[in-house]
Amino acid sequence: MDTIAARALTVMRVCATLQEARIVLEPNVMEILGIAINRYNGLTLRGVTMRPTSLAQRNEMFFMCLDMMVSAAGINVGPISPDYTQHMATIGVLATPEIPFTTEAANEIARVTGETSTWGPARQPYGFFLETEEVYQPGRWFMRAAQVVTPVVCGPNMVQVSLNAGAIGDVQQIFQGRNDPMMIYLVWRRIENFSMPQGNSQRTLAGVTVSVGGVDMRAGRIIAWDGQAVLQIHNPTQQNAMVQIQVVFYVSMDKTLNQYPALTAEIFNVYSFRDHTWHGLRTAILNRTTLPNMLPPIFPPNDRDSVLTILLLSTLADVYSVLRPEFAIHGVNPMPGPLTRAIARAAYA
């Protein structure tokens, strides 16, 4: 299946180079287009030409690229247009060993398959405590009953710890059971002035320490902590104290947008508004997948099918911009006139 996807990607990118009717094509472009179009026309009985000039010819070439895109992604789009019918035989075209694919396309498909089939440490973009259901007021001292050290969450990446005079205690439990981190990068600081429950202000005196595995850590410096070693705070002073612990970032096995080069840009390209026809076509294609059909996914896609679909559909978007086809999509009423931000914004409503 990797070679099928690589051929589809190669042919679509070659078609995206046909920006002028009289352009001098590179030899490899001529070879790829010649073989691919010959095989495609033979199996589908279409009439795709190597140098599309008329609207009908541009439409035919775009429909060929659309066939290749959905075939390589394993998508059956169904009846989405009165002008287009998906040719299931296209998968046989892409399986033809005579159609060459570029090294670049093969490497990209190999990266998609390789990265989505395994896991690796990745810096996560969201706050460590993002899914916490309740937070406490920052800078306000709070102590639970029968405790001398109380850590609480006060933000998506922030913990504050209240300590009684002379108290010492471990606080690693507040981090555990969340996000399955491999490493957490922390910075701790004294809260110089804080509010007591009665409303009066109090200071944290110098001398408060934070240690990881029994080793004192300097305030204001990034600490690499595995989330398992004892994270202990000691207030040797004779009055209450407060400490702030900030999660600068953490590393876990969760997938991120870095699993594939330029995945962020590919997603933007897929979901960008070009015109109402493309908007309807992209929606119809993605309706047959697990990806959202109009707005980018909240979390990075983490399976091969989704990442491959984004890569192929982004390339099809480039072909659409170059060939400028005109055809109907069921339920879509194109609006004449120049594209404006207001028109694009209204399409997502």
Swiss-Prot record:
Gene3D superfamilies: 2.60.120.170, Bluetongue Virus 10, subunit 1, domain 1 (1.10.250.10), Bluetongue Virus 10, subunit 1, domain 3 (1.10.170.10). Belongs to the orbivirus VP7 family. InterPro entries: Capsid_hemagglutn (IPR008980), Orbi_VP7_capsid (IPR001803), Orbi_VP7_capsid_C (IPR023178), Orbi_VP7_capsid_N (IPR023176), Virus_capsid_a-hlx_vir (IPR008935). GO terms for biological process: fusion of virus membrane with host plasma membrane. The gene is Segment-7. The lineage of its organism: Viruses, Riboviria, Orthornavirae, Duplornaviricota, Resentoviricetes. GO terms for molecular function: host cell surface receptor binding; structural molecule activity. It holds the Pfam family Orbi_VP7. It comes from Bluetongue virus 13 (isolate USA). The VP7 protein is one of the five proteins (with VP1, VP3, VP4, and VP6) which form the inner capsid of the virus. Glycans are attached at residues 193, 287. It is found in: Virion. Keywords: Capsid protein, Glycoprotein, Outer capsid protein, Virion. This is Core protein VP7. Homotrimer that assemble in a complex of 260 capsomers on an inner scaffold composed of VP3. GO terms for cellular component: viral envelope; viral outer capsid.
